[in-house]
UniProtKB/Swiss-Prot annotation:
Its EC number is 4.2.1.-. It comes from Staphylococcus haemolyticus (strain JCSC1435). The keyword 4Fe-4S does not apply. InterPro entries: D-Glu_cyclase, Putative_hydro-lyase, UPF0317. NCBIfam families: PRK05463.1. This is Putative hydro-lyase SH0274. Keywords: Lyase. It comes from the Bacteria.
Amino acid sequence: MNYKQSSPEVLRQLIRDGELVGHTSGMAEGYIQANVVILPSKYAYDFLKFCFRNPKTCPLLDVSEVGAHSFPYYGPYADIRTDVPKYRIYEHGQLIKEVDDITDLYTEDMVSFLIGCSFTFEHALLEAGLPVRHIEEGHNVPMYRTNIPAESSGYFKGNITVSMRPMTMTQAIKATEITSHFKNVHGTPIHIGTPEELGITDIDKPDYGEAVTIKPNEMPVFWGCGVTPQSVALDAKPELMITHSPGHMFITDIKDSELND
Protein backbone atom coordinates (compact mmCIF):
# COMPACT_ATOMS: atom_id res chain seq x y z
CA MET A 1 0.00 0.00 0.00
CA ASN A 2 1.24 3.48 -0.86
CA TYR A 3 1.08 5.27 2.49
CA LYS A 4 2.52 8.42 0.94
CA GLN A 5 -0.56 8.89 -1.24
CA SER A 6 -3.12 7.46 1.20
CA SER A 7 -5.77 9.69 2.73
CA PRO A 8 -5.67 10.57 6.43
CA GLU A 9 -8.97 8.77 7.02
CA VAL A 10 -7.67 5.53 5.48
CA LEU A 11 -4.43 5.70 7.46
CA ARG A 12 -6.22 6.41 10.74
CA GLN A 13 -8.46 3.40 10.14
CA LEU A 14 -5.41 1.20 9.56
CA ILE A 15 -3.90 2.53 12.78
CA ARG A 16 -7.18 1.97 14.65
CA ASP A 17 -7.32 -1.61 13.38
CA GLY A 18 -3.73 -2.29 14.44
CA GLU A 19 -2.53 -2.77 10.86
CA LEU A 20 -0.22 0.27 10.86
CA VAL A 21 2.06 0.56 13.87
CA GLY A 22 5.24 2.36 12.76
CA HIS A 23 6.30 5.98 12.54
CA THR A 24 4.31 8.22 10.19
CA SER A 25 7.05 10.23 8.46
CA GLY A 26 6.33 10.50 4.74
CA MET A 27 2.69 9.38 5.03
CA ALA A 28 -0.39 11.26 3.73
CA GLU A 29 1.70 13.67 1.70
CA GLY A 30 0.38 17.21 1.87
CA TYR A 31 -1.59 16.74 5.09
CA ILE A 32 -0.74 18.15 8.51
CA GLN A 33 0.59 15.73 11.10
CA ALA A 34 0.39 16.62 14.77
CA ASN A 35 2.05 15.87 18.07
CA VAL A 36 -0.40 14.82 20.77
CA VAL A 37 -0.61 15.72 24.46
CA ILE A 38 -3.53 14.56 26.61
CA LEU A 39 -3.95 15.77 30.20
CA PRO A 40 -6.51 15.90 33.01
CA SER A 41 -8.43 19.17 32.74
CA LYS A 42 -6.83 20.72 35.84
CA TYR A 43 -3.51 20.95 33.95
CA ALA A 44 -5.00 22.18 30.68
CA TYR A 45 -4.77 25.94 31.23
CA ASP A 46 -1.14 25.83 32.32
CA PHE A 47 -0.27 23.70 29.32
CA LEU A 48 -2.20 25.99 26.98
CA LYS A 49 -0.11 28.91 28.25
CA PHE A 50 3.05 26.83 27.88
CA CYS A 51 2.28 26.33 24.19
CA PHE A 52 1.61 30.01 23.57
CA ARG A 53 4.86 30.94 25.31
CA ASN A 54 6.87 28.42 23.26
CA PRO A 55 5.52 28.66 19.70
CA LYS A 56 8.69 27.37 18.00
CA THR A 57 8.59 24.06 19.85
CA CYS A 58 4.89 23.80 20.71
CA PRO A 59 2.91 25.50 17.90
CA LEU A 60 -0.63 24.82 19.05
CA LEU A 61 -3.06 23.70 16.35
CA ASP A 62 -6.15 22.79 18.35
CA VAL A 63 -7.53 21.89 21.76
CA SER A 64 -10.41 19.50 22.29
CA GLU A 65 -13.41 20.05 24.48
CA VAL A 66 -13.12 18.32 27.85
CA GLY A 67 -13.77 14.61 27.34
CA ALA A 68 -14.08 14.87 23.54
CA HIS A 69 -12.53 12.16 21.36
CA SER A 70 -12.25 14.15 18.13
CA PHE A 71 -11.48 17.60 16.73
CA PRO A 72 -14.22 19.33 14.71
CA TYR A 73 -11.76 20.85 12.22
CA TYR A 74 -8.63 18.68 12.26
CA GLY A 75 -10.32 15.28 12.56
CA PRO A 76 -14.11 15.23 12.95
CA TYR A 77 -14.30 11.46 12.39
CA ALA A 78 -11.11 10.62 14.27
CA ASP A 79 -10.79 9.04 17.69
CA ILE A 80 -7.82 10.35 19.66
CA ARG A 81 -7.96 7.21 21.85
CA THR A 82 -7.09 4.83 18.99
CA ASP A 83 -5.80 6.79 15.99
CA VAL A 84 -2.16 7.32 17.01
CA PRO A 85 0.17 4.38 16.16
CA LYS A 86 1.82 4.41 19.56
CA TYR A 87 1.20 6.36 22.78
CA ARG A 88 3.38 7.05 25.78
CA ILE A 89 1.91 6.97 29.28
CA TYR A 90 3.55 9.17 31.94
CA GLU A 91 2.60 9.06 35.62
CA HIS A 92 4.08 11.65 37.99
CA GLY A 93 6.81 12.42 35.45
CA GLN A 94 7.81 8.80 34.86
CA LEU A 95 7.39 7.00 31.53
CA ILE A 96 5.37 3.94 32.53
CA LYS A 97 4.70 2.21 29.21
CA GLU A 98 3.92 2.53 25.52
CA VAL A 99 0.58 1.32 24.18
CA ASP A 100 -1.36 1.39 20.91
CA ASP A 101 -4.77 2.17 22.45
CA ILE A 102 -5.70 4.43 25.38
CA THR A 103 -9.44 3.75 25.53
CA ASP A 104 -9.15 2.30 29.03
CA LEU A 105 -7.20 5.35 30.28
CA TYR A 106 -9.20 8.13 28.66
CA THR A 107 -11.80 9.69 30.95
CA GLU A 108 -14.43 12.38 30.53
CA ASP A 109 -12.05 14.77 32.33
CA MET A 110 -9.29 14.62 29.68
CA VAL A 111 -8.29 17.44 27.33
CA SER A 112 -6.39 16.71 24.11
CA PHE A 113 -3.94 19.07 22.41
CA LEU A 114 -2.68 18.93 18.83
CA ILE A 115 0.73 20.53 18.27
CA GLY A 116 2.27 21.17 14.86
CA CYS A 117 4.83 18.63 13.60
CA SER A 118 7.77 19.17 11.27
CA PHE A 119 6.79 16.06 9.28
CA THR A 120 4.23 18.40 7.70
CA PHE A 121 6.80 20.48 5.81
CA GLU A 122 9.04 17.60 4.74
CA HIS A 123 7.29 17.07 1.42
CA ALA A 124 7.92 20.76 0.60
CA LEU A 125 11.63 20.20 1.26
CA LEU A 126 11.59 17.11 -0.96
CA GLU A 127 9.77 18.93 -3.75
CA ALA A 128 12.52 21.57 -3.66
CA GLY A 129 15.14 18.87 -4.11
CA LEU A 130 16.41 19.10 -0.53
CA PRO A 131 17.45 15.98 1.39
CA VAL A 132 15.33 14.54 4.16
CA ARG A 133 17.78 11.92 5.30
CA HIS A 134 15.59 9.94 7.70
CA ILE A 135 13.07 9.35 4.91
CA GLU A 136 15.88 8.36 2.52
CA GLU A 137 17.18 5.85 5.06
CA GLY A 138 13.78 4.63 6.28
CA HIS A 139 14.33 5.90 9.83
CA ASN A 140 12.43 7.93 12.37
CA VAL A 141 13.71 11.52 12.58
CA PRO A 142 16.51 12.02 15.16
CA MET A 143 15.48 14.18 18.13
CA TYR A 144 17.61 15.60 20.93
CA ARG A 145 17.05 17.17 24.33
CA THR A 146 18.89 20.48 24.62
CA ASN A 147 20.21 22.82 27.31
CA ILE A 148 17.88 25.62 26.15
CA PRO A 149 15.14 26.33 28.72
CA ALA A 150 11.56 26.66 27.57
CA GLU A 151 9.41 29.49 28.88
CA SER A 152 7.68 28.01 31.92
CA SER A 153 3.98 28.02 32.77
CA GLY A 154 2.68 26.77 36.10
CA TYR A 155 3.50 23.08 36.37
CA PHE A 156 5.30 23.05 33.03
CA LYS A 157 8.99 23.88 32.83
CA GLY A 158 12.14 22.32 31.39
CA ASN A 159 14.36 22.36 28.33
CA ILE A 160 13.30 22.24 24.70
CA THR A 161 13.76 19.32 22.31
CA VAL A 162 14.86 19.65 18.67
CA SER A 163 14.67 17.51 15.53
CA MET A 164 17.61 17.35 13.12
CA ARG A 165 18.03 17.07 9.35
CA PRO A 166 21.55 17.21 7.85
CA MET A 167 22.16 19.56 4.90
CA THR A 168 24.83 21.64 3.23
CA MET A 169 24.84 25.34 4.11
CA THR A 170 23.31 26.20 0.73
CA GLN A 171 20.55 23.67 1.32
CA ALA A 172 20.01 24.93 4.87
CA ILE A 173 19.46 28.46 3.58
CA LYS A 174 16.89 27.17 1.09
CA ALA A 175 15.22 25.07 3.81
CA THR A 176 14.99 28.15 6.02
CA GLU A 177 13.23 30.03 3.24
CA ILE A 178 10.78 27.19 2.64
CA THR A 179 9.96 26.51 6.28
CA SER A 180 9.40 30.20 6.99
CA HIS A 181 5.99 29.60 5.36
CA PHE A 182 5.13 26.89 7.89
CA LYS A 183 4.99 28.87 11.14
CA ASN A 184 2.24 26.63 12.54
CA VAL A 185 4.46 23.55 12.28
CA HIS A 186 7.71 24.87 13.85
CA GLY A 187 8.73 27.25 11.05
CA THR A 188 12.41 28.03 10.48
CA PRO A 189 15.37 26.23 12.09
CA ILE A 190 16.37 27.37 15.55
CA HIS A 191 20.05 26.43 15.09
CA ILE A 192 22.45 25.38 12.33
CA GLY A 193 25.67 23.47 13.00
CA THR A 194 27.61 23.26 16.31
CA PRO A 195 25.35 20.85 18.23
CA GLU A 196 27.49 21.33 21.34
CA GLU A 197 26.04 24.84 21.68
CA LEU A 198 22.69 23.14 22.31
CA GLY A 199 24.22 20.78 24.85
CA ILE A 200 24.19 17.86 22.41
CA THR A 201 27.36 15.88 23.09
CA ASP A 202 26.94 13.04 20.57
CA ILE A 203 25.00 13.71 17.38
CA ASP A 204 25.04 9.97 16.62
CA LYS A 205 23.05 9.19 19.77
CA PRO A 206 19.68 10.96 19.60
CA ASP A 207 17.45 10.93 22.67
CA TYR A 208 14.49 9.96 20.50
CA GLY A 209 14.20 8.55 16.99
CA GLU A 210 17.16 7.13 15.10
CA ALA A 211 20.56 8.41 14.02
CA VAL A 212 21.06 9.29 10.34
CA THR A 213 24.08 9.72 8.10
CA ILE A 214 25.70 13.16 8.06
CA LYS A 215 27.92 13.52 5.00
CA PRO A 216 31.31 15.31 5.18
CA ASN A 217 29.99 18.45 3.44
CA GLU A 218 26.87 18.64 5.61
CA MET A 219 25.98 20.11 8.97
CA PRO A 220 23.11 19.37 11.35
CA VAL A 221 20.11 21.68 10.97
CA PHE A 222 17.84 21.81 14.03
CA TRP A 223 14.15 22.63 14.25
CA GLY A 224 11.99 23.03 17.34
CA CYS A 225 10.26 19.75 18.16
CA GLY A 226 6.86 18.91 19.59
CA VAL A 227 8.43 16.19 21.73
CA THR A 228 9.34 19.07 24.07
CA PRO A 229 6.26 18.43 26.28
CA GLN A 230 7.52 14.91 26.93
CA SER A 231 10.81 16.27 28.22
CA VAL A 232 8.98 18.89 30.26
CA ALA A 233 6.75 16.19 31.77
CA LEU A 234 9.78 14.89 33.62
CA ASP A 235 9.78 18.12 35.64
CA ALA A 236 6.04 18.92 35.65
CA LYS A 237 5.14 15.46 37.02
CA PRO A 238 1.39 15.56 36.31
CA GLU A 239 -0.39 12.56 37.78
CA LEU A 240 -1.19 11.41 34.23
CA MET A 241 0.03 12.63 30.86
CA ILE A 242 -0.50 10.79 27.57
CA THR A 243 1.47 11.70 24.44
CA HIS A 244 2.26 10.22 21.05
CA SER A 245 5.43 8.15 20.95
CA PRO A 246 8.10 10.21 19.12
CA GLY A 247 7.59 9.93 15.37
CA HIS A 248 4.17 8.28 15.69
CA MET A 249 1.92 11.21 14.89
CA PHE A 250 -1.79 11.99 14.61
CA ILE A 251 -2.59 12.50 10.92
CA THR A 252 -5.15 15.29 10.48
CA ASP A 253 -7.66 15.94 7.71
CA ILE A 254 -6.23 19.39 6.94
CA LYS A 255 -3.83 20.06 4.08
CA ASP A 256 -0.66 21.95 4.86
CA SER A 257 -1.55 24.45 2.13
CA GLU A 258 -4.26 25.73 4.48
CA LEU A 259 -1.58 26.74 7.00
CA ASN A 260 1.12 27.73 4.53
CA ASP A 261 1.41 31.51 4.76
